């Protein structure tokens, strides 16, 4: 009984992760500038991958009865490196003066880099 519930939760997490990853891929294709694309890739792709790995983790607990440490390390690795790498890529694009779209109206980093020669 409890095994079926855990497997059902695992399937729900895997399906949600796949849907979030698919929406992320569509967003990366459709968004106009690197800053919007980086936001989509850094936030929602990380969430989709974590849901997929967590669903797999639950499945292994339910079927085999053991905790897979590789999946836990994978979840932690993606949780740390996904948003961090996206942030660094967007910061590098800003330093290279990559243009915004014309819809972007706010530049919050303008004053931070005003005096620095980067």
Curated annotation (Swiss-Prot):
Pfam families assigned: PhaG_MnhG_YufB (PF03334)
InterPro entries per UniProt: PhaG_MnhG_YufB (IPR005133)
CC per GO annotation: plasma membrane
Subcellular location: Cell membrane
Keyword Iron set for record: no
Topology term for the membrane: Multi-pass membrane protein
TM helices/strands, residue ranges: 9-29, 47-67, 69-89
Keyword terms of this UniProt record: Antiport, Cell membrane, Hydrogen ion transport, Ion transport, Membrane, Sodium, Sodium transport, Transmembrane, Transmembrane helix, Transport
Taxonomic superkingdom: Bacteria
Function summary: Mnh complex is a Na(+)/H(+) antiporter involved in Na(+) excretion.
Protein family per UniProt: Belongs to the CPA3 antiporters (TC 2.A.63) subunit G family.
Protein name (record): Na(+)/H(+) antiporter subunit G1
Species assigned in the record: Staphylococcus haemolyticus (strain JCSC1435)
């Amino acid at each position: 009984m409890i095994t079926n519930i855990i497997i059902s939760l695992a399937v729900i997490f895997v399906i949600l992760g796949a849907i979030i990853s698919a929406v992320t891929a569509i967003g990366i294709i459709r968004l106009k500038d690197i800053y919007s694309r980086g936001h989509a890739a850094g936030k929602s792709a990380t969430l989709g991958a974590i849901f997929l790995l967590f669903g797999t983790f639950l499945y292994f607990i339910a079927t085999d009865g053991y905790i897979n440490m590789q999946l836990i390390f994978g979840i932690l690795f993606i949780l740390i490196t996904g948003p961090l790498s996206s942030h660094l890529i967007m910061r590098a694009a800003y330093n290279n003066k990559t243009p915004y779209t014309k819809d972007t109206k706010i530049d919050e980093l303008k004053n931070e880099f005003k005096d620095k020669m980067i």
